[in-house]
């Protein structure tokens, strides 16, 4: 039933047979290419779904059939990925293992076609003249344990990262990604995320090199927004820190920015950014990769002006490793490098807008069960209290039958021996 493992350490994700739900036709891994496969997906697209046969219980786990341009492919079906075999390519931890648990159905819901519908804190359509903007609390001021009816801009970036599976690393990952690769992956997911009556891709600006296809697409999105009056969203890496240009931060400078308006930021937004993302800004100044998501309103264009300018309405930052895995600290970065070096498969659970939830720094995906790993690098009373809560949580052997792993910097300066993957103990 399963396709052969192809990695150097035997921990690769597997391909399993796929059944087309409405016809019952089964395609083993060896037949999941070619004309018959593509024809079957095209006929099934929008009318049914696939079933992954990764478990020997005769109950296929649903998978989505999606279209990208002229191509069709099979992808995870939302809220069911945790029911797959741990080594299945469609497996992912459940919403309860990330910050997605912190939203109501008003904030995020699954459409009948498998797409997502979300409601943002700040709408893409500007309020009518005289109508007030909603007052948004900074990320650290959110009420604890309160499920939210809207998604913040940072939550949207976490959602896109998760849906594109950029927060997951497999031991057979073929190569490092570029900013343009990441932009393409985000665009693919934006096409299936609905905000009001439109999909996100219609207002999304992404990293682009001059004169390339992405540059032209960005320009078209900006031109369309000038006609419609919609607000835009840009995602991209912060440009390398320049102490002369960036110390006062009058503008948000993105890397690979072609087609993106010049982003001017006012004092109030700048103060909020520095308060909420001090660690990320510090890492940026140290040369680390930091991605930004920016919601903007285009400024009127003066006659004879060729440069588009926009006012930054909101901005959130995300710290990343060289492999674009999200990180919350420099110690997580050290651990992430070690996991990659050791040939492990893992995922980084995204917090979204649910900062008080208990979930680990990473989940190991090669243990055949939920296996949390943590790095503890602080010693404040508040941090120690949270660490105690996590220790109690992970002691539950029903949830975590193989236990958990941690690296406490105050106990061990070097990373302790990692647990062996399931394949080595078999």
What positions do the PLM features span?
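A structural signal for short, well-ordered beta-strand segments and their strand-loop junctions
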Residues: 53, 234-236, 348, 406
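Intrinsic-disorder/low-complexity linker and hinge segments
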Residues: 103-107, 131-140, 318-327
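Short low-polarity hydrophobic stretches
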Residues: 76-79, 236, 373
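N-terminal cysteine/histidine-rich coordination modules
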Residues: 2-124
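Residues that cap or initiate secondary-structure elements
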Residues: 58, 82, 124, 242, ...
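Broad gene-expression machinery/nucleic-acid interaction feature
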Residues: 73, 233, 359
């Amino acid at each position: 039933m399963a396709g052969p493992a192809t990695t150097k350490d035997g921990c690769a994700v597997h391909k399993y047979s796929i059944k087309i739900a409405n016809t019952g036709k089964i395609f083993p891994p060896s037949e999941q290419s070619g004309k018959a496969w593509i024809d079957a997906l095209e006929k099934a697209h929008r009318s049914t779904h696939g079933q992954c046969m990764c478990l020997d219980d005769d109950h296929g786990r649903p998978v989505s059939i999606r279209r990208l341009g002229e191509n069709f492919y099979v992808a995870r079906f939302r809220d069911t990925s945790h029911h797959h075999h741990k080594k299945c390519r469609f497996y992912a931890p459940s919403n309860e293992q990330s910050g997605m648990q912190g939203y109501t159905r008003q904030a995020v819901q699954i459409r009948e076609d498998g797409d997502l519908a979300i409601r943002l804190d700040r709408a893409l359509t500007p309020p009518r003249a005289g109508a007030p903007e909603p007052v948004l609390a900074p990320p650290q001021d959110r009420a604890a344990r309160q499920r939210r009816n809207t998604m913040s801009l940072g939550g949207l970036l976490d959602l896109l990262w998760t849906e594109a599976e950029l927060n997951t690393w497999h031991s057979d990952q073929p190569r490092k990604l570029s900013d343009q690769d990441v932009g393409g992956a985000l665009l693919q997911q934006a096409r299936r995320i609905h905000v009001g009556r439109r999909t996100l891709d219609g207002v999304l600006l992404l990293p682009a090199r001059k004169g390339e296809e992405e540059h032209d697409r960005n320009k078209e999105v900006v031109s369309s927004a000038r006609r419609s009056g919609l607000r835009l969203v840009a995602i991209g890496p912060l440009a390398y820190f320049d102490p002369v240009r960036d110390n006062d931060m009058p503008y948000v400078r993105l890397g690979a920015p072609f087609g993106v308006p010049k982003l001017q930021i006012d004092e109030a937004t700048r103060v909020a950014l520095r308060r909420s993302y001090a660690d990320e800004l510090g890492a940026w100044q140290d040369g680390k990769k930091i991605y930004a998501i920016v919601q903007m309103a285009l400024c009127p264009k003066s006659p004879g002006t060729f440069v588009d300018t926009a006012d930054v309405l909101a901005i959130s930052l995300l710290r990343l490793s060289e492999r674009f895995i999200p990180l919350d600290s420099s110690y997580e970065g050290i651990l992430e490098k070690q996991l990659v070096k050791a040939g492990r498969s893992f995922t980084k659970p995204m917090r979204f807008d649910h900062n008080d939830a208990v979930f680990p720094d990473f989940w190991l995906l090669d243990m055949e069960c939920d296996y949390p790993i943590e790095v503890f690098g602080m010693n404040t009373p508040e941090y120690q209290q949270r660490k105690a809560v996590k220790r109690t949580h992970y002691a539950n052997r029903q949830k975590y039958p193989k236990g958990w792993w941690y690296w406490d910097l105050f106990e061990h300066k070097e990373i302790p021996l990692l647990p062996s993957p399931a394949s080595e103990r078999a």
